[in-house]
């Protein structure tokens, strides 16, 4: 028989926060919510209090030298979680400011005891020693400018430390949360993004792939997905392997978005729902083309990417939620350049690492991911991604322009497919009637990737001959 004490976890009801804590707040724990002014400390405390308080588990909110209760309530009631019916029934607000100004701490302690030990929330370090006997789950809210102040005596006494901060770079601001410690809980490490809206706080856990995080569809060993363009499937030796990530690179107007549309339409024909995060266009622009029919039919879900100062964690959260809702097998991110611009500047320095985590999680779910990237066509320099992210993709398809007989032509080639054979041809392609048509292979030319193919022998040999004649 085990004598181990089981710690009850109190569910806060804040989206993403309980997961961060490791399942909720430990009952009867003494916690500190710390951070800079305006970082969301009071809102976090109120949102938890309104979610957890009930007639059998009442809550007390003591104010000391901060905002007066009336002023604080005036602003907090703007949030949707604020429930007027709980005031004085399940929640009571007590102002201790006058007692503190008079310097009579004994009166403060006496008044706290008068309000009942079972629902006490404490606010100073000296009261921490009484927590166990009072059996109160307590949150102390304090303003601290530097994380180094966590070494103070209040933090030593605390069972849990929740640190909130605001990161500012230029005109961009991002809110971050860190569970510094939470005794008895397996909490998530690192800093995590959160947002405040009319509904209160929503936490977006830092994206780290774990096999157990999401269900993974089962595919056959050799199962492949059609791109919706038969000739491209042929160049891929039967289509793109299921669960792969594909990077489609090309200059502006080369047909990258058109290929994503073909990819999603093929999914609809095969009963494979899709999800698209379109950073190049607003939802209105996106839904004005062929994708509108896919969305209205329920075959494709659209992620709202128009919010400013996004984080990778927010985008991944929305993608995973939509994938699970749609039971999607195909995911499109159009494009990586637009994706980077949608991010807060604070996250752009780590864009490569963040993209790696995102792709790993999405493909780990068993979805097949198609990403597009703008190719700066310098012709003489072959660069598949301006971010150095080409290695993240399992397969790469390159689209380019070439000047041939005084005309700009489109060509396409399969650069790589990890662990699979593929065509090495460079083939003409065109867009006719809103459909991609892949034509014949370029034969009899050299220097194709330079953008200025030369009919016949090697361009380098011809140049050497011209130089020798010039002598």
Model-identified regions with their sequence ranges:
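Scaffold/interface architecture of coatomer-like assemblies
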Residues: 22, 30-37, 44, 48, ...
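Conserved P-loop
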Residues: 36-100, 105, 242-247, 251-314
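Conserved nucleotide-binding/hydrolysis micro-motifs of P-loop NTPases
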Residues: 39, 65-70, 97-102, 138, ...
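Pre-Walker A adenine-sensing motif
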Residues: 12-24, 228-239
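Extended interfacial segments that mediate partner engagement and assembly in macromolecular machines
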Residues: 217-229, 234, 241-249, 257, ...
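Short glycine-/polar-rich loops that comprise or flank the Walker A/P-loop
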Residues: 28, 55-58, 88-91, 134-136, ...
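P-loop NTPase motor core
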Residues: 31, 106-157, 161, 311-396, ...
